[in-house]
Regions:
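Core catalytic alpha/beta fold that binds nucleotide/phospho-ligands
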Residues: 1-221
């Protein structure tokens, strides 16, 4: 394992147009540690972190900033020098480096970052407990049929979590986020997007299976 300023890098993947990393923020377990690492980050990230009331939220926000900072080193940049702007649907970008695209995600004690030279979206989720409302919100009819054909609850939970992270990453890569209606498109076994009710931009995907969690990255082209 590799450590950087209080986060533990647990997975990294280099793809054609981006790099993806997942880290644990468990070491950021005191207010003093979080305050110390915030001194390394941008005013925007510090303000965002301090808006969280609880230690867990602050650790995730600071950890996401640290992971982005770590990955920006590849380009000779530091997060503390970054200024951000926000797109129409709320997706942030690096104001002075439009050639670089990034996206962040967090779940429980994990943070994920995708950074590269194509529009990217990343999502990380711990394996979820299935609820019908989530299934209906997330899945197309054919995906629900595939889910119902599975024998074990464990297989169903993993399949659903994988599909959810793939769809979240895709929605974030397109910049539309939660405005994207997830049942309006399906993701096949070949990891290709299939538009069900409207034109949907093409993308490629990668899944990262972690212990009790799943991460996914989408690269729009």
């Amino acid at each position: 394992m590799e450590y950087y300023c209080g986060i533990e890098i647990i997975e990294q993947l280099t793809l054609d147009c981006c790099k993806v990393m997942v880290a644990s923020v468990k070491p950021l377990n005191t207010s003093e540690m979080i305050e110390a690492v915030l001194a390394r980050l941008s005013p925007s990230r510090r303000d965002k972190t301090m808006r969280y009331r609880h230690l867990k939220g602050k650790a995730l926000s600071a950890g996401a900033g640290l992971l982005l900072d770590y990955m920006l080193h590849d380009y000779g940049l530091r997060e503390r020098d970054m200024r951000y702007e926000v797109g129409e649907h709320g997706k942030p970008s690096l104001k002075e480096h439009p050639e670089l695209h990034f996206n962040l995600s967090h779940s429980d004690t994990l943070v994920a970052c995708a950074l590269g030279q194509c529009p990217v979206g990343v999502d990380v989720q711990h394996i979820v407990t299935l609820r019908d409302s989530l299934v209906q919100y997330t899945m197309s009819r054919e995906e629900i049929d595939a889910l119902n054909a599975m024998a074990s609850d464990e297989d169903k939970a993993l399949f659903f979590t994988q599909l959810w992270t793939l769809k979240e990453s895709y929605a974030k890569a397109t910049g539309r986020g939660l405005t994207h209606e997830f049942p309006a498109f399906a993701i096949g076994s070949d990891n290709k997007v299939k538009a069900l009710s409207r034109l949907t931009p093409p993308a490629t995907f990668r899944l990262i299976n972690l212990q009790d969690a799943v991460a996914a990255v989408a690269m729009k082209y």
